[in-house]
Amino acid sequence: MATMNRCPSWNGYCKPDRAMPGLNEWNGRSMRPSFLWGRASTYSSPDLLESRKHMTTVAERVRQSLRAIPDYPKPGILFQDITPVLGDGQLLAEVVREMVRPFGDRKVTHVLGIEARGFILGGAAAMVLGAGFVPARKPGKLPWERATEAYDLEYGSDSLEAHRDSWPRGSRVLVVDDVLATGGTARAAGQLARGLGAEVVGWSFLLEIDGLGGRSRLEGGQCHVLARG
């Protein structure tokens, strides 16, 4: 679920760039399901063009499926409910495929999903990439030794936490969340990952809220967004 605040009090997103090699075996050697991938092998130029056309179609279906709820959870906020997207199995599979496509050849070892809807999309993305999944949680939710990264909100501050043993040093991490707005939360997630010795390969989001400048706050990795609104 994504919230669009008419006053920028948001956090979180990026740019489709490279197509992903198809990975279409689900067997003892590979855990990438064929129904998520489509064609195998690296994309040639015509294939890349077709892939981008398909991503545009998926983005349009996402925008059509989002349920806009005005004045929720408080007056002045237009809440973008993503549960219709999650509830459509075919669309969800296509969404996850398109969210990870630019990172298929980037040797991602772990996906860092931002609480809470980043857990849903990030877990699915990790499965498709054959990577581990790590939750970036709000304070006080993790039971083991934690690393913490604080970030500013419009009124106050918040923080994200992850276990200190989330991955070995030198791991390659993709940050996933549902929405990119002002970019504060996503930036903090990237800093949290780097503080734990990882290289941030990039960020991937389902939806970007236009006009809030979130992507300008994300440094040192590719930023990919499926739909804009």
Ranges and model annotations:
Residues 2, 8-10, 16-21, 25, ...:
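Short amphipathic, helix-prone segments within low-complexity/disordered or flexible regions
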Residues 52-108:
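Active-site-facing substrate-recognition patch
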Residues 178, 183:
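Conserved G/P- and acidic residue-centered "switch" motifs that form tight phosphate/ATP-binding loops
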Residues 42-54:
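Short, Lys/Arg-enriched N-terminal segments with co-localized hydrophobic residues
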